[in-house]
Amino acid sequence: MRDSVLSVIFALALFLECYTPSMAIPMGKMEDTALEQDTLDSLLNESVADKNPDSVRSGSSKIIVLADSGMWKNLNRGLPLYKLKAAAAGLDRALTLDRREADQDLSPSISIVRRDTMRCMVGRVYRPCWEV
């Protein structure tokens, strides 16, 4: 629910940004963009924070949208959120332990000689599987 609300707010902010008057500036008024950059730099300075907020023009204010960090992680992996949740659920199922009886063989199709010579990784060393 929270992700969908954040996505809607983010999309709305992008949609409104496309239709602001600042996007339709004629080429003759490009010098004003440098003036707006200076205004933005002055807003970020600490000296402006001490002044009265009424002194800042209302037309130069911008909305900054911060997304949830979990959403960005999912975007970097390239998988949609619903597929990641399904994969995580599948991973939990894959990590379940299977118990075997002691008298069960590994496989009836493997001969006893071959089974005894098979090697299993124990730590950093390969040892015969029957020693494990």
Swiss-Prot record:
Looking up InterPro entries in the UniProt record yields: Prepro-melanin_conc_hormone
Q: What is the lineage of its organism?
A: Eukaryota, Metazoa, Chordata, Craniata, Vertebrata
GO BP annotations of the record are:
chemical synaptic transmission; neuropeptide signaling pathway
Role according to the record: Plays a role in skin pigmentation by antagonizing the action of melanotropin alpha. Induces melanin concentration within the melanophores. May participate in the control of the hypothalamo-pituitary adrenal gland axis by inhibiting the release of ACTH.
What this protein is called in its record is Pro-MCH 1
Kindly state one GO CC term assigned in the UniProt record: synapse
Xref: Pfam families: Pro-MCH
**Disulfide links within the chain:** C120-C129
Establish whether keyword Disulfide bond is in the entry: yes
Q: Which GO terms describe its molecular function?
A: melanin-concentrating hormone activity; type 1 melanin-concentrating hormone receptor binding
Transmembrane segment boundaries:
none
Q: In which tissues is it expressed?
A: Pituitary gland. Produced in neurons of lateral basal hypothalamus which project both to the brain and to the neural lobe of the pituitary gland from where MCH is released.
Q: Extract the signal peptide range.
A: 1-24
Which species does the entry assign this protein to?
A: Oncorhynchus kisutch (Coho salmon)
To which protein family does this belong? Belongs to the MCH family.
Keyword check for Signal, yes or no.
yes
Q: Which UniProt keywords apply?
A: Cleavage on pair of basic residues, Disulfide bond, Hormone, Neuropeptide, Signal
